[in-house]
Amino acid sequence: MKDNIVIITGITASGKSELCDNLIKKHKNISIINCDSKQVYKEIPVITAQPPKQKEFYRLYGYVSARENYSVGLWLEDLKREVNNALKNSRIPIITGGSGLYISSLIKGLSSIPQISQEVRENVNELRKNLSKEEFYKLVLSKDPRIQGKIFINDSHRLSRALEVITETGKTIFVWQENRQPPLFNNFKVYTILPKREDIYRKINSRFIEMVENGAIDEVKNLLSMNPSPHLPAMKAHGVPEIIRYLKGEITLDEAIQIAQTNTRHYAKRQYTWFKNQFPNSQVIDCANKLTEFGIF
């Protein structure tokens, strides 16, 4: 695609949604297209901080069932359709979100990792739950020595993914990542929002309390009433596992809030490192509102 496409990414709670609201007020010829792997799920709009549904401007938010094992490959198909529709209607596509795999697949192309079987996923998940962090890391390292220095002990999601891939395929995940399909776009601008850490951490803490006050607990209750598999992506959205533990009586509400805040801050910390290393051609902004002060198109 030869048309300019804008990608706005960055740390969780960095102000991407507020920025998009401001851009809509300033520019009427834009389409905001979601690039967050959890904001696609229609049953959890509060706990995933989805924007209000203004169909005129927002696309790919809250349109997938939490029962679905939605993937980056499916998202790329949906994204291509929405970008084409925007360009056809003389709108500027603004793709925004902070999911690392989605962003990487968008900019660098989708890796050709085969589908992982449900049996392998469940076995890896059981290992992750039953082993300590140190034991799980040593296990994955013994299966795939190439993770050393690339995937770290606290990154349980990437460790699980690495173990799934080498168990399913017999090849390290890095071999598959080195063989990618061509990216969808060849002409885009990338902006990465990286505010000060203390500002992000403060926003994470206050935002989760607001989510609880605005119905996140009822949202998770409704999610559980669907009896979804615990391995589905929607069940792993930030705050969902902690609220489930509260609803089961395992922890108090205050404990659930504190644990969710801590886990989300740890996630943001990993995002800082990831974004700084992944996209050297990106324009880094320390405050989202700065993007409304100069032309991003």
Curated annotation (Swiss-Prot):
Catalyzes the transfer of a dimethylallyl group onto the adenine at position 37 in tRNAs that read codons beginning with uridine, leading to the formation of N6-(dimethylallyl)adenosine (i(6)A). Its EC number is 2.5.1.75. It is an enzyme of class 2 (transferase). Its cofactor is Mg(2+). The gene is miaA. Monomer. HAMAP family: IPP_trans. The keyword Lipid metabolism does not apply. GO terms for molecular function: ATP binding; tRNA dimethylallyltransferase activity. Substrate binds at residues 12-17. ATP binds at residues 10-17. The keyword Nucleotide-binding applies. Belongs to the IPP transferase family. InterPro entries: Dimethylallyltransferase (IPR039657), IPT (IPR018022), P-loop_NTPase (IPR027417). Residues 36-39 are annotated as: Interaction with substrate tRNA. It comes from the Bacteria. This is tRNA dimethylallyltransferase. NCBIfam families: miaA. It catalyses: adenosine(37) in tRNA + dimethylallyl diphosphate = N(6)-dimethylallyladenosine(37) in tRNA + diphosphate. It holds the Pfam family IPPT. Keywords: ATP-binding, Magnesium, Nucleotide-binding, Transferase, tRNA processing. The record marks 99, 121 as: Interaction with substrate tRNA.
